[in-house]
Amino acid sequence: MQGTWMVLLALILGTFGELAMALQCYTCANPVSASNCVTTTHCHINETMCKTTLYSLEIVFPFLGDSTVTKSCASKCEPSDVDGIGQTRPVSCCNSDLCNVDGAPSLGSPGGLLLALALFLLLGVLL
């Protein structure tokens, strides 16, 4: 019986382990208002960056409007130069879960760690 539980646990960890370790980013393929880009996506394992491209910088100056952006998972991301005044489509990159909430790096979500902890606690109770 104990062997069956170990196999079951291995299958669960194998299935959800990649999702727990995969990066999560906000994604919107077409330019939308930044406040409306709220879809979250589990990125492919080779996509280790969240990328945000700002499309309508001129309409938010002097920071009264809502910017238009695209957001995605990316395997490569080259951020814009911070001194690049006048760039038409600035790009920002980050590498923690849901860090591209505003197009700037932020603290990530500990969801994967919590899932792993819950599974190990469940294993301890079952055995």
UniProtKB/Swiss-Prot annotation:
Protein's cellular compartments: Cell membrane
One GO CC term, this protein: side of membrane
Keyword check for Disulfide bond: no
Domain UPAR/Ly6 span(s) in chain numbering: 25-100
Glycosylation sites: 46
Signal peptide: 1-22
PANTHER family in alphabetical order: UPAR/LY6 DOMAIN-CONTAINING PROTEIN (PTHR16983), UPAR_LY6 DOMAIN-CONTAINING PROTEIN (PTHR16983:SF16)
Protein name: Ly6/PLAUR domain-containing protein 2
Gene this chain is encoded by: Lypd2
